[in-house]
């Protein structure tokens, strides 16, 4: 008896944002994309669910902060000359009781909108400074520093300078062991309030870093205007070091030029999102001083640095 078999094939994919540093998050996105294709009727309602979830997160953040649901993990920053840890970037996580561990991309924009950015930053600063002070008490050379991400709006908050001074005083951390990492923002070089605040922080001895330099709003115009100590290169600059030969050669020239410029200006260039041995080797050959990324270590719990 003749029988007819029908088969259907469905394809789905999840895009990987340039700044993504957690492969588990990318895997969850791929699995969700597959589920959406397999059962589109179910996911037709998911847009409404996502709106509800965003609202739920927004309204529950303050309670979560009071309950201690936020915590920090740290991605080591490596000195390329000898592969030793010289510092770490503090990364915020939310251990939600029902949604699991949430990365900042799920809630930071909510914090910006509901006025919780400064309280969250205060939490991160206090925890990070306390942790790195403990590490420094148990390490010899090099003495580690901690890098804390801060938004332009938080920098401009009237109480931010006093907050930083207070945290440094309470924890006993030397100011030079704290680095404030600023996301690219056009306001940084235009807003006199932001420029003045960064100069005041620099006068305290706090390091100033510009994240994802040269990719978005950030440009060479930042350098003479702001007291910059570190610029971070990431995204395509690093990714293309493993690309096809045409893209690789062009990015090598740009990366070399930025490292050379940093040396001439007394600015440390830190490569981020370094994921392969060949990327690390090229950066080392170019004279890059520091790097971070999955090739060296993923984000680690605080206990790792206490061992």
UniProtKB/Swiss-Prot annotation:
Q: How does it sit in the membrane?
A: Multi-pass membrane protein
| Entry keyword Calcium | no
Q: Which SMART domains match?
A: EAL (SM00052)
**Known PROSITE patterns for this protein?**
EAL
Q: Where in the cell is it found?
A: Cell membrane
**InterPro entries from the entry?**
Cyclic-di-GMP_PDE-like, EAL_dom, EAL_sf
Q: Which residues form the EAL domain?
A: 54-307
A GO term (biological process) for this protein? biological process involved in interaction with host
Please give an example of a GO cellular component term from this record: plasma membrane
Instruction: Provide the alphabetized UniProt keywords.
Output: Cell membrane, Membrane, Transmembrane, Transmembrane helix
CDD domains cross-referenced by the UniProt entry: EAL
List membrane-spanning regions.
Answer: 158-178, 203-223
- Pfam families in the record: EAL
Asked if the keyword Transmembrane belongs to this entry, the reply reads yes
Molecular functions per Gene Ontology? cyclic-guanylate-specific phosphodiesterase activity
Listed name of the protein:
Uncharacterized protein Rv1357c
Record the organism: Mycobacterium tuberculosis (strain ATCC 25618 / H37Rv)
Taxonomic classification, please? Bacteria, Bacillati, Actinomycetota, Actinomycetes, Mycobacteriales
